[in-house]
Amino acid sequence: MPRRRRRASRPIRRRRRARRSTAVRRRRRVVRRRR
């Protein structure tokens, strides 16, 4: 049973990190194009 709880909390953390990395990559690309 403890394995099921760990698996549910792992995907949630990966989704939050993926959203932050996409926002940072889009902002860096915009700064390079403007310069």
Swiss-Prot record:
This is Sperm protamine alpha isoform 2. Two isoforms exist, a major form and a minor form. This is the minor form. The keyword rRNA-binding does not apply. GO terms for biological process: cell differentiation; mitotic chromosome condensation; nucleosome assembly; spermatogenesis. It is found in: Nucleus; Chromosome. It comes from the Eukaryota. One of its GO terms (molecular function) is DNA binding. Protamines substitute for histones in the chromatin of sperm during the haploid phase of spermatogenesis. They compact sperm DNA into a highly condensed, stable and inactive complex. Keywords: Chromosome, Developmental protein, Differentiation, DNA condensation, DNA-binding, Nucleosome core, Nucleus, Phosphoprotein, Spermatogenesis. Phosphorylated in immature sperm. Dephosphorylated in mature sperm allowing a stronger interaction with DNA. The modification Phosphoserine is found at S9, S21. One of its GO terms (cellular component) is nucleosome. Its main location: nucleus. Disulfide bonds: none annotated. Gonads. Residues 1-35 are annotated as: Disordered.
